[in-house]
């Protein structure tokens, strides 16, 4: 490829064959991730809808379908680890429409039990956003893709905000107000569960103008991505006094700090709003269906699943910390269900963490945790 030349796999697609369409696809939410079925090779495949990522396909499925490498790309994962990937182009079936020449990063999920379980066959990512008007409707468990905005409900009376995109892979960004004198942009990332995850520059700017009400600290890893588990270190959450997306006020929000910019608006916002993205027009719509409520408290710990189920993060003074949980402890059972690295066990564990109480057994103790 000549220096500065845009690779053909970025310009050839993706494309939709049909001119006029409205499709509705059933979706399922688990641990903040949105699952849907996509047809590839004549079979339904389970994908994750992740607006904060380019589209990906598991190496095993790419091999099964005989997809040819059309390029390579280098990027960083959520924790800053450099990842080099082969690129393939694929045809996808979504309801009654066909997507052609979709560029997909080939990823080996098999090296991580959690990735293999939770990412399934791949990711439907941000480069498909300009192809139609997308609507994520959790109350109806439906993802819609419409050729025209006028085909959709949930727009009249909704909060219309600006949606920014800066070329391939068409990652969506939103205007955010973190304090009276602190404005920024955040990625709309449905692959991230928390309502808001704050970047170091945004945190510093918000703190400087008095927009932070306080901090909560913890110890452990900020999570696992394709480049592996991030190292254990001191972690912090910041209570933002008043957060807004454009003029959509979200009020006081507790935000975990991430390692990199930008900040993220995550899938938790879908638990209160039907969200419609019109990338071509640069607009996003939030139709509130549930009254804004205080953020739900947590048990105060997180799990990792590679090499067995282990405690990966504990927040200070939380129910988990008070019960004696420590980073690195092996978890034996959750709600009396044995914990291991199998996919059913991982899904059971993540479901258990959504309850109001949790019985946990680990190597060294047992406790009944309740949300504060």
Where do the protein language model's features map onto the residues?
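Pepsin/retropepsin-fold aspartyl endopeptidases
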Residues: 1-372
């Amino acid at each position: 490829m000549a220096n500065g030349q845009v690779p053909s796999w970025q310009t050839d697609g993706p494309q939709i064959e049909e001119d006029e369409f409205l499709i509705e696809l059933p979706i399922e939410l688990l641990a903040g991730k949105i699952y849907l079925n996509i047809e590839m090779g004549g079979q339904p495949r389970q994908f994750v809808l992740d607006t904060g990522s380019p589209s990906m396909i598991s190496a095993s499925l790419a091999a099964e379908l005989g997809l040819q490498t059309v390029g390579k790309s280098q990027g960083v994962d959520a924790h800053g680890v450099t990842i080099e990937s082969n690129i393939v182009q694929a045809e996808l079936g979504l309801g009654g429409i066909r997507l052609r020449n979709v560029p997909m990063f080939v990823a080996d999920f098999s090296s991580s039990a959690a990735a293999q379980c939770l990412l399934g066959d791949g990711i439907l990512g941000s480069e498909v956003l300009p192809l139609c008007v997308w609507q994520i409707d959790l109350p109806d468990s439906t993802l819609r893709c419409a050729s025209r905005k006028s085909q959709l409900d949930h727009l009249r009376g909704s909060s219309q905000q600006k949606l920014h995109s800066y070329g391939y892979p068409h990652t969506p960004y939103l205007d955010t107000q973190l304090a009276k004198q602190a404005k920024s942009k955040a990625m709309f990332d449905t692959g991230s569960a928390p309502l808001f995850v704050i970047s170091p520059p945004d945190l510093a700017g918000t703190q400087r103008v008095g927009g932070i009400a306080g901090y909560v600290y913890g110890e452990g890893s900020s999570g696992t991505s394709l480049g592996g588990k991030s190292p254990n270190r001191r972690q912090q959450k910041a209570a933002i006094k008043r957060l807004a997306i454009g003029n959509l006020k979200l009020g006081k929000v507790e935000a975990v700090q991430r390692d990199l910019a930008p900040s993220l608006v995550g899938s938790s916002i879908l638990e209160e709003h039907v969200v419609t993205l019109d990338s071509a027009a640069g607009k996003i719509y939030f139709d509130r269906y549930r009254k804004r409520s205080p953020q739900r408290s947590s048990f105060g710990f997180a799990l990792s699943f590679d090499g067995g189920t282990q405690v990966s993060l504990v927040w200070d003074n939380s129910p988990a910390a008070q019960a004696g949980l420590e980073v690195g402890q092996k978890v034996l059972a959750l709600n009396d269900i044995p914990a291991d690295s199998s996919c059913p066990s991982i899904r059971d564990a993540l479901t258990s963490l959504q309850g109001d109480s949790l019985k946990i057994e680990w190597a060294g103790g047992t406790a009944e945790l309740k949300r504060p």
